[in-house]
Amino acid sequence: MTGGIHIEGLTKRYGEGDTAVDALKGVDMKVAPGEVVGLIGPSGSGKSTLLKCLGAVIEPTSGRMTLGDQVIYDNGWKIRDLRELRRDRIGFVFQAPYLIPFLDVTDNVALLPMLAGVPNAEARKRALDLLTALDVHHRAKAMPSQLSGGEQQRVAIARGLVNRPPVILADEPTAPLDSERALAVIRILNDMARQFETAIIVVTHDEKIIPTFKRIYHIRDGVTHEEAGDGRGFE
């Protein structure tokens, strides 16, 4: 598999000896460039642990991870600068928005590409284009404290997409949104995946969007199983 996300035999153990807990037990997973895949499972099944490993937030115990064309982990980290990886190669969309309180909406979204060296005008254009697509452009100059929960989430989604990273990890991105806006977010993710050859994993419990995925991974007790989805939202 060239590009995308490729996970082989990934494990994560917390603790030692009799008190050790195996959160991931040999996870295998593939997401092709240009593909959006759903990841579902009950609370405590290992979803968040898997995303944290993929996002280089925590270190796995063993296994192999490839993001894009780069092996980032093979029974140990294979890259030196994990902060640069998280900034430039991976887009994160969290259930809690975590917007910077002293920056307005546009600056919250434009900050990451500016830090990556994108000229200010281009970074702001990218930000406004995404804010428009997510129907929150009318709040471009508002401060985070002035936004509703749903508006904050849409701004956070724009921020996760603005750098056009090869990999996007989205954790419950549509939880606070109504059906129309939730499906709009999935359409935007799919459009971005196709346009920029982005590999996207969406962790969700949201029954509104589960039927949109063409492929779904179920995770339970740290083990993943793949199945075909309906894919209706991608037509």
Whereabouts are the PLM-identified features?
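ABC family nucleotide-binding domain
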Residues: 4-5, 10-219
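ABC-family P-loop ATPase nucleotide-binding domain
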Residues: 1-13, 225-235
